[in-house]
């Protein structure tokens, strides 16, 4: 949906589109980088810094441009940081789909930790357990991306367009942000 002359709130789980790469993905979380408001999503949904990111679809309002892009052979992680340049239209929230508020981070979840994620394409939450850490995968049949955490999904599904979405731990003290959904299956058992 196009948002004009009003403040729209960006939050984890929202649909965003890289119009330069013609790719829809999911917003992971909002924050700031060097004092600048930003959003975080997957790196494999884009091509390079300065790609244009829009809210919802290619006809939506422009959010901003890719500021930092990580998704090349030998990179650690699969993410990009988008600088919000349209601050007259967009505000940010630390919530995930208006259901969970991010109260902190869990940057190194231990093996066995139960992790939740949000599937934008099915409008549902799923979960799984951390199987391995610091995993390297062959992405797009050509690039080795390392530093990933492998989660065995035991409930829910991940579809095309869910990439970039939030992974988090649902703790009694609030949701702890863990990272960005990469969405690559490593085998047929749900990993």
Language-model features and meaning:
Residues 1-6:
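Autoinhibitory propeptides
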Residues 8-147, 169:
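Serine endopeptidase catalytic core focused on the charge-relay Asp
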Residues 22-24, 152-155:
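Short, Gly/Ser/Thr-enriched beta-strand-loop segments that form substrate-interacting elements
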Residues 46, 122, 174, 185-187:
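Residue-level marker for beta-strand->alpha-helix junctions and adjacent short loops that shape enzyme
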Residues 139, 144-153, 176-191:
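Membrane-proximal bilayer-interacting regions
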Residues 156-180:
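Catalytic nucleophile loop of clan PA
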């Amino acid at each position: 949906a196009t948002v004009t002359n009003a403040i729209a709130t960006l939050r984890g789980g929202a649909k965003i589109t890289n119009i330069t790469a013609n790719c829809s993905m999911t917003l992971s979380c909002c924050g700031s980088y060097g004092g600048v408001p930003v959003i975080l999503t997957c790196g494999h949904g884009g091509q390079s810094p300065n790609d244009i990111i829009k809210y919802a679809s290619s006809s939506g309002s422009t959010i901003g441009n890719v500021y930092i892009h990580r998704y090349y052979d030998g990179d650690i992680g699969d993410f990009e940081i988008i600088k919000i340049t349209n601050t007259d239209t967009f505000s940010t929230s630390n919530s995930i789909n208006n259901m969970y508020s991010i109260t902190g981070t869990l940057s190194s979840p231990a093996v066995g930790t139960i992790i939740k994620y949000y599937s934008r394409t099915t409008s549902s939450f799923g979960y799984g357990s951390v199987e391995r850490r610091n995993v390297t995968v062959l992405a797009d049949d050509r690039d080795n991306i390392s530093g990933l955490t492998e989660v065995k999904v035991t409930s829910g599904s991940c579809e095309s367009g869910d990439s970039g979405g939030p992974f988090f731990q649902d703790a009694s003290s609030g949701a702890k942000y863990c990272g960005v959904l990469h969405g690559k299956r490593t085998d047929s058992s749900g990993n």
